[in-house]
Amino acid sequence: MDTTWSSSMNVERWRKEFAFEAAKLDFLSKFAGPSENSAIQIVDDLKAKKGSTIHVDLIMKLLGSGVTGDNIMAGNEEDLVQYEQSVVVDQLRHGVKSKGKMDNKKVLTDFRKTALRQLKIWFNEKLDSDLITVLSASPTRTLGADNGGTPRIDSASKSGLVAADVITIDDIRLLKTLATNPYTSTHPKIRPIKNNGENYYCLVIGSESAYDLKTSSAYNTLMRDAWWRGEKNPLFHDAKVVVDNVLVHEYEGISQFDDGGGSTVHGEVNLFLGAQAGVFARGGDHSWHEETVDRGNKLSVTGGLIYELAKTKFNSIDFATIAYYTATTDLSA
């Protein structure tokens, strides 16, 4: 008797399980949420309606001083400034295929489980990687590490690097200052990420920058306290250190370069993030499709997602991202 590869009930079961398992980013899920107070805002506006364009409102900080006592409020209200960014979604799919009925007749369920697990991992890692690429692309707000010298803000952040310009605790503090008090009026203030009434920012650094940071005496001093380790919020999970309310996280997929300092300095493009630094726009849940091929002998499984990842911008300026260029110890050498 022939093996029945699938039924509509089985396909729906696996579709729901895949949609649940693959519905979030992997590493960057700790920074993502539906609120405009998340570093990566998840927008699902197209789940219930047709279309390919999602409009995201970028929320600016209120700057007014308010009124005191019985002074008149009418006429002294502050305009709520919002800017709109359009994000166009597209479809991404990937699939796997079984070897055949003879190979799978005793392990059909295992094949589906393996397909779900591997496609979930592939989508999670793909989204993480793509988001880092998007956030790193063509930065308009930058800081170049400068070992004890004058900070290089925007100008020569990468080209001015020398091998000694590794990550420092002082630079992390400077990044926060640049977020809250931009050095030029063309840069909007970067709103913090809210958690339990506190304001935080995130700095995502590469593995080599993390290595350099951990070997510094300043890092070891901060680690004597490590108060954040008891925090249950995902934002704090695996944070390497917290500097002046900047949560430092390590991610091995951070962009690297070998042409710093003009041509020879190896380093990384680390990412400082505030609220609404990026957008994860989704046009629906992950899809799961099964069909037989080779005249019913093999099962093909395809996972898909309609989405787009984007870095937010205000008047062509990065809205809540600062690229932090550092020289690093080349661990691949």
PLM regions: where:
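N-terminal "assembly arms/tails" that initiate or stabilize quaternary assembly
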Residues: M1-V89, I317, T321, T326-A333
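Core alpha/beta structural scaffold of self-assembling particle/tube/pore-forming proteins
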Residues: D2-F20, K105-A333
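Generic secondary-structure boundary/loop-capping signal
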Residues: N37-V43, E84-S86, R93, K99, ...
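Short, solvent-exposed loop/turn segments at the edges of secondary structure
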Residues: G51, V89-Q91, E198, G296
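Beta-strand elements of well-folded, non-transmembrane domains
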Residues: M60, G100, L305-L309
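Generic short alpha-helical segment signal, independent of protein family or function
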Residues: K61-G64, K101, K120, N124
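Short acidic, glycine/tyrosine-flanked loop/strand segments centered on an H-E-D-like triad
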Residues: D79-V107, F272-A275, G283
